[in-house]
Amino acid sequence: RGPDREGICPRGGYTPAMYDFAVVGVGPAGARFARRAAEAGYDVVAFEQGTVGTPLACSGHVSTDVWGYVPDDAKQRLLQNRVYGARFHVGGPDTAAHPFYKSEEISNVIDRVELDRTLASCADEAGADVREEHTVADVDERHDTVELTVSNTDGTETVRAKMVAGCDGPTSRVRRQSGLPEPDELLHGVLAFDPESDDGDFVDVHLTVPRFFAWRIPRGDAGVEYGLAAPPGTDVTERFERLTDAYG
């Protein structure tokens, strides 16, 4: 596999390789897109500005549908706990709980860092050129191509593609430089982990923050995850400390 054309610029400079797709961001969305495009026979390059999976970007509490996106043998490595329901609270953990549950598992808790790495590995095995430690510094949309200025430890290069997929998160450079509208709202989130194991099969949801919620997720031998998200301007740190202090 490889780019479909390369050559020499009229002024003697090197013409960058032309890919069908350049993917910016190799989280779950970017890795999945890169894999599907590569499997369909397209030439794909995917850039991750750091190391895939770090820093942790989101909770590991996911739908059981996730197993349709990874190899069959990945479940044993990724699965940390099975969830059968949730307890909703209008206050802290000492307030009344309103449980919702089923007799079969409704969601799973996984190793989120390893999920990202597994999905990126699938994209690589499908033929995508996955590059870590590559930061896209500029996106220049031309008539029939997109030119990306990409920096890495060896310097800066220009990569050309027919299309770019912006999978670079809530503060997306691709979105901003392409003139696409900003999200109506961004949330400020915080996560923390207690290493003490917890095999409970219910998550706790606290409706104590504006426009979103706080949570406690048992992760089996991996411990307990606490999290909270709220609009900017909300005292997220203070609210989060109250949550974790209440759980002791």
Where are these regions (language model features)?
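Extreme N-terminal starter segment of soluble prokaryotic enzymes
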Residues: 17-21
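Predominantly flavin-linked oxidoreductase catalytic cores and closely associated redox partners
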Residues: 26, 124-248
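Glycine-rich FAD pyrophosphate-binding loop
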Residues: 22-26, 32-57
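Conserved dinucleotide-binding and phosphotransfer motif residues
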Residues: 40-42, 122, 126
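A conserved beta-strand/loop capping segment in the N-terminal third of enzymes
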Residues: 61-118, 125
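Aromatic/hydrophobic pocket-lining residues that form π-stacking "cages" and hydrophobic walls in ligand
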Residues: 33, 119, 145-148
